Amino acid sequence: MGAKTEFRSSEPITDSERSQINSVRAMLQEKLPDGIPDDVNTDLNLCRWIRGYHGDTEKLVKNFATYLASRKAAGFVGNDFAEKFFELPSIAPFLQFIASSRLQDRQWSDEHNAFLFVERAWSQPKEFIKTFKTSDYLLHCFGYSEMLQQLILRREKKQSADKGPVQFIVIFDLNTVNITDYVNPMSGYMKLWQIRSELWQDWFPEMVQRIYLTNPPRLLGLLWKVARVFLSEENLKRIEIISDKSDLAGKFLPPWLVPKEYGGEFVNTVPPGDETGVSVRRKITSADYYKPYQHYKEHGIDRPKSSHKDVSPAEKFVFKIQVPNGKKLLWDFTASGELQFAIFRGNNRNDLVFPSLHLITNKLNEEGSLDNVSDSEISFEFQNLSGYFTLKLEYTVAII
């Protein structure tokens, strides 16, 4: 007997949606100089975007183009990406601090046309933002979401034509959360969570079927208030708070799908996940805090003198630099507020060499190095996301 739930598998593509898919595909082909990559140029994937954007094709096309350029710049491409993600040099050093699913798509439900994803919430938010630059964490979340998408796309290639898009089901464990840490919406870790949520909702729409919050705090009203900061109204409707863990496998999901820790029958035996399938994180100490400007020392130079720029509300500042043949770039910056940051070749925002990311530098500066920019004009773009306040920017760019 199936578990009782309001959320079943995603509906198959309708005739009306097929017409929209053809229209959106044509718009994207016109906008993208290299066309749509084959892996994401499927009817089911474009259907996900159309459903997620509710007919706002202008916003859809803009975000799809930025997503593709950012994916390429981050190196999150290739048929084996799902297998190599956890080994990437930009990802591997931070995995010890993150407790997230290693189940891939193994816990699969035909009834839901979805697989299970399990994550444990941060236990040390104040230390976390001293250990990760905003871009470090966003790139991890970006890459992880892309890995899940690739698993979805593989499933969709094999399924029958009468099925809808594949999705995943989230169990999000709040056991280690002190909800009062999240009362201040302006805190650095609240902002980081907000930006993370914005990224997956913008670039990976309609991939999540349902979000089950387990081990919730007693202050449920405060929990809903916090959730509203992170999620769209549509994704808020996907949340189910599980106060009694026996309900998860009794009322909502089949017992064989749910880890034993959450009242089900499943016990993971595949490393590096624990019995729930989640990687085991270690405690962050002060020795783990990020040390800025090390990339200058590693290349044997002192940090050059910084430049300053005031960026008016909602305006962009673009700094251009010509990189000679055989040279590379080192850079860093801090900003007084939130900004959209990207690095691209010349004037072509579709040719990103660093992903377009919404960033903050509350605790740590942003910095990095670029090796693949020899003999190119490179543009650093800083967009002030505030409509009211001037952004005070301090930045350094060095050629070596």
UniProtKB/Swiss-Prot annotation:
GO terms for cellular component: cytoplasm. InterPro entries: CRAL-TRIO_dom (IPR001251), CRAL-TRIO_dom_sf (IPR036865), GOLD_dom (IPR009038), SEC14/CRAL-TRIO_domain (IPR051064). SMART domains: SEC14. Residues 304-399 form the GOLD domain. Gene3D superfamilies: CRAL-TRIO lipid binding domain (3.40.525.10), GOLD domain (2.60.120.680). It comes from the Eukaryota. Coiled coil: none annotated. Residues 87-270 form the CRAL-TRIO domain. This is CRAL-TRIO domain-containing protein C34C12.6. The lineage of its organism: Eukaryota, Metazoa, Ecdysozoa, Nematoda, Chromadorea.
